[in-house]
A protein has these predicted regions:
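Class I SAM-dependent methyltransferase SAM/SAH-binding core
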Residues: 66-117
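N-terminal auxiliary segments of SAM/dcSAM-dependent transferases
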Residues: 1-22
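A short acidic, Gly/Pro-enriched loop at the edge of an enzyme's catalytic core
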Residues: 118-128
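Conserved SAM-binding loop and adjacent beta-strand
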Residues: 37-53
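Conserved beta-strand signature within the Rossmann-like core of class I S-adenosyl-L-methionine
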Residues: 154-162
């Protein structure tokens, strides 16, 4: 890995973590979409999409599935390797979704802001997955209510949440509120990056939040 690639990756990741509004996210990912898979996912040995995908399939997740914060489709690719399920993608960045569409794994793409409500009817999806969206500078715990709104009765959601982000924003409090509505929730900790990652963040972890309606 060249020093130039390492430096560029580090700068972009820190910028992503420091975003403060939906508008910031749209602007930032507009300029990173075409290079994201190589510049970040490849260089960082980003295995979180694989972690989410394997958990979803292990728990017998079914379609149709909505990939929330789908980005360039890395999670969708991992799911498609394990099972052929109908998948839709949603992201705040149209440019990221355009890259995802080229992979041919989603039958529908929806540009939308999870924090403001998605243009989707209640109880639409049997499965909802998300990798890397609930993290610094992106989406907080309040968005879990929107996730549960569009999850069908008997459905399954598997969402990754950066572990530091979880504790700093109080995901536990929202999770307790969701449990009071009858949702079953489980949390496991996984690595975000693989053994090839050499960045300062190489040991960062995420919680896989599993919600059963």
């Amino acid at each position: 890995m060249s020093e130039q690639n390492e430096s560029k990756k580090h700068i972009n990741l820190q910028k992503a973590y420091n975003l403060s509004s939906p508008e910031d996210n749209v602007d930032f990912y507009r300029g990173w979409a075409e290079d994201y898979d190589i510049d970040f996912a490849g260089v960082m040995d980003y295995i979180l999409p694989y972690q989410v995908a394997t958990q979803f399939i292990k728990l017998n997740g079914e379609g149709p599935v909505l990939d929330v914060g789908a980005g360039t489709g890395l999670l969708g690719i991992e799911i498609s390797k394990l099972n052929k399920i109908e998948m839709h993608a949603t992201d705040i960045s149209e440019e990221m979704l355009l890259v995802a569409e080229k992979k041919g794994i989603y039958s529908k793409s929806i540009v939308g802001d999870l924090t403001k409500g998605l243009p989707i009817l209640d109880n639409t999806y049997n499965g909802i997955v998300s990798s890397g969206t609930f993290t610094h500078g992106h989406v907080g715990p309040e968005a879990l209510f929107e996730i549960t709104r569009i999850l069908s009765k008997g459905g399954l959601a598997v969402l990754s949440v950066n572990s530091k982000h979880w504790h700093s924003l109080g995901f536990d409090n929202v999770l307790e509120m969701l449990k009071e509505t009858g949702l079953v929730a489980n949390v496991t900790e996984v690595r975000i990056y693989g053994d090839k990652c050499e960045a300062d963040t190489k040991d960062d972890t995420a919680y896989l939040l599993t919600l059963s309606a």
